Amino acid sequence: MTSREQLVQQVLQELQDAVESEGLEGLVGAALEAKQVLSSFALPTCREGGASPQVLEVDSVALSLYPEDAPRNMLPLACRGEGSLLFEAASVLLWGDVGFSLELRARTVVEMLLHRHYYLQGMIDSKVMLQAVRYSLCSEESPEMTSLPSATLEAIFDADVKATCFPSSFSNVWHLYALASVLQRNIYSIYPMRNLKIRPYFNRVIRPRRCDHVPATLHIMWAGQPLSSHLFRHQYFAPVVGLEEVEADGAPGPAPAPPALAPLPPPAKTLELLNQEPGLSYSHLCERYSVTKSTFYRWRRQSQEHRQKVAARFSAKHFLQDSFHRGGVVPLQQFLQRFPEISRSTYYAWKQELLGSGTCQALAPKEVQVLGELEQLPEEQMAKGLGCSSLAAASPSMVLMQRAKSYLEHCISLNTLVPYRCFKRRFPGISRSTYYNWRRKALRRNPSFKPAPALSTPGAPQPASVPEEALLPWKGEGGEGAGKATAGGPPAPHEFLPPKVPLSRWQRRLRRAARKQVLSGHLPFCRFRLRYPSLSPSTFWVWKSLARGWPRGLSKFQTQAPALGKGGLREAKEKQEKEAGRDVTAAMAPPAGTPLHVGASPGEDPGKAQGGPSGEGAMAQGRPHSRSLSSRPVAEAAVGGGDGQVLVMDMLATTKFKAQAKLFLQKRFQSKSFPSFKEFSALFPLTARSTYYMWKRALYDGLTLVDG
């Protein structure tokens, strides 16, 4: 019977023969055959044959490079072999000798070939690993290595895989990742306290690709030739074992090395220096340590002094926003007494930003009462709700967060779901992820929550609910129009329509300025979203269509409906200029059984907002009431005018685009080939990076993005 060593030698020989073929097709075929051979026997879990392990020797070079932040009471050992000794080090750690190094090499080659896409793009740490690969051939960070394209990295990967088939080759970072998957163990990659600019990419815990149990951890150290006090060149890997393991194995004590670790030169603890001396400048630091300017400022942002300044600035800004939403701005003197570290110019810049954003909405008496009750919560209850101490909850930012969380929980307890855009207007300092986390927890506490239907028939009994004035989640959504009903039908009941509030002077001025710039053609969409975040994207496209003179009156929805008369077309053409600033929600969700209404400006005559008898009003009345609610708003919005058509098509395209992106990520996740953000953004360029990582985190947490 063929022995284990002969089978491994045969597998390696077949892989070496396949290297000569062009491309990776022959090598992948040989890897599939090698997998069948190697799967016939598993790696042993303990030493076979009862032979005593080889005499352990401490690697003095690796010991002098052993970093201070690595695990204590451990020693790097010396290995015998060729190349970078990665597989020899793993064999010594697991079985006490280098007898299984060739088998580990063969299994690693098979792993890297059969899961090539995973190691290049699919895994969570792929970006960190690829960055480490860029720096593995140099000791300093350089622009040339940082800008290596993905095609070059794939070529390096293929060359490394082919070279790994030969025992004298050198290993790279992805060999560590593949070896961790082969051994089903974590690998603690210990990197010396040298090459500080690239050290974070190498000094980390590497986890296997898939593991069904809680994995143990192997410690492997990067060792090599020291070049200076802060530089070294990697040459080989050294196994690191604990002192108690050496004593338990009965191995003779390491005679050449002293029992205690020799004192190492102190590393460059720049972050601690910045915490001790906040005024430390880069010119003083670069004389003592090899630190680039970008690294220095990144560490400076992490220093304690900078974090305190950022926290104080955050609290001051949200205190000013809170006072502004209450109906008035705190005077400068009172603001400086409370926050003396904030400058006068910063105060006026924030004040002008608040006044120009158009978010100042008058609070209704009921809402003031609700917010007043939320403010009267005791500090212990606030601290309990946010999971922090009462001293931390007393800060203005914690008070704002507690008020926002209590407001959202109160709305859900009243069977009302506040959309994020309305919640953002009320509490601009709360992020989207925080809002959805709070909403998910509040919905779990209220299992009987059922949101009220958006449309209902006039004859159906209305459930008892809290008056909308107590919550006012939709008050800030109104456009310039007040929403008038068209002729040809009875006016809609008041309880079916969302409350409308006329726009303030600042909002009208803001919309006029934005509309003028869009119509002039000098404001692109990206700059429009940055300069006017309170205006919806559909408003931009409506104004853009007016500027370009697009024929928006004809659509596939209108071709299926009766043709408009000449008078109706003329009136619709004259109304396009006035309908550009109307409220979006008024065209999206008209009540069932009522005719479509179009927006009109506050000073416009209601009669002008109506279409002709043979135009929009007649078409809206001709719709049967048995029609489904899902298609009714789409058709009516398209018939009612160009604004509704552009808005509906924009919303449908956005919804379909997001659904396709979610389905794409979910399918790739199920097929174990999750795409990187670069690949994902090439297919879905309009999806933000934060949205991609939010969906990725949800999939890895076991959630489902798309049902069905």
Curated annotation (Swiss-Prot):
It comes from the Eukaryota. GO terms for cellular component: chromatin. Residues 473-499, 561-636 are annotated as: Disordered. GO terms for biological process: regulation of transcription by RNA polymerase II. GO terms for molecular function: sequence-specific DNA binding. InterPro entries: Trp_repressor/repl_initiator, Vertnin-like, VRTN_OTU_dom. SUPFAM superfamilies: TrpR-like. Residues 568-582 have a biased composition (Basic and acidic residues). Belongs to the vertnin family. PANTHER family: VERTNIN. This is Vertnin.
